[in-house]
Amino acid sequence: MTEIATTSGISSVGLLSVGAYRPTRVVTNDEICENIDSSDEWIYSRTGIKTRRFAAPEESAASMAIEASREAIAKAALTGSDIDGVIVATSTHFLQTPACAPIVAAALGCQNVPAFDISAGCSGFGHALGIAADMIRGGSAATILVIGTEKLSPTVDMTDRSNCFIFADGAASVLVGHSPIQGIGPTVWGSDGEQAAAIRQDIDWISHAENPAGPRPFLRMEGTAVFRWAAFEMGKVGQQAMDAAGVKPDEIDVFIPHQANSRINELLTKNLQLRPDAVIANDIEHTGNTSAASIPLAMAELLATGAAKPGDLALLIGYGAGLSYAAQVVRMPNS
């Protein structure tokens, strides 16, 4: 019997660089409150958000991904031709087809490479990172661009007092490739589809097209249900990720949870029993919840400000729509 040949790749994989793109328009809580009965103090006390960024009308998930990726590629001293895979995590590429990733790959000069999207809500970046690491270890690629990009502002009903102050726009990219030491631990991921309605689009696009005079689709969220699930279940996921990577809580230098709500992340930090001096990402304060882009955006900010250092051991936990989650232990990139 003829055996089918297979491939194998390098075992030590890590993050080479990170690039970020933040839209220029800053939206304050006071501006949000022009459409709802609320206040800057109320929003901040419950979410930790002071401001967020909204993309311009001409900007898209793809255009922001391209800008973030150009920065990541430049920081790694590479060119588009050095990249042999592009994975985009997004829920806001507003075309059924073509996917966002091939558009991004072409703009960056990544020719004839696998380029595809994944949609896993706010945990999308963790899913994409896990897939990229496994592709490289399996020999399917050597250097992969992993991107989280979202333009959530058009999906939000700005009169919905339950979530209109939460979501925002932005993109960030990491380059994944060979590392002298292991830089990405095993991915712990999963989903709970029984809670799918907790974060959802309320009307599908076909129903809207058949009744254009009716209400348009918006993003809806059951905030209390999501808060309880994330605050009390994601600590277990984080511990599983540390166990899988063979590290202990007191060895974690940096904690980068999905930037959904600073109160959730305070509870997660406590439940994980991290070191008192561990750096906790709080990019949400001035960025809002950017879904699949939030973890790499927070990573970029920590490195840019010097709060975290290259090589620091970091725990990443993404969680959100699905409900879904993905977590890894990684080493912070050099740039």
Curated annotation (Swiss-Prot):
CDD domains linked to this entry: KAS_III
Location in or out of the cell: Cytoplasm
One Pfam short name: ACP_syn_III_C
One GO biological process term: secondary metabolite biosynthetic process
Active site positions: 122, 258, 289
Molecular function terms from GO: 3-oxoacyl-[acyl-carrier-protein] synthase activity; beta-ketoacyl-acyl-carrier-protein synthase III activity
InterPro entries registered for this protein in UniProt: ACP_syn_III_C, ACP_syn_III_N, FabH, Thiolase-like
Gene3D superfamilies recorded: 3.40.47.10
PANTHER family named in the record: 3-OXOACYL-[ACYL-CARRIER-PROTEIN] SYNTHASE 3 (PTHR34069), BETA-KETOACYL-[ACYL-CARRIER-PROTEIN] SYNTHASE III (PTHR34069:SF2)
Function, as annotated: Catalyzes the condensation reaction of fatty acid synthesis by the addition to an acyl acceptor of two carbons from malonyl-ACP. Catalyzes the first condensation reaction which initiates fatty acid synthesis and may therefore play a role in governing the total rate of fatty acid production. Possesses both acetoacetyl-ACP synthase and acetyl transacylase activities. Its substrate specificity determines the biosynthesis of branched-chain and/or straight-chain of fatty acids.
Name of this protein: Mycobacterial beta-ketoacyl-[acyl-carrier-protein] synthase III
Organism field: Mycobacterium marinum (strain ATCC BAA-535 / M)
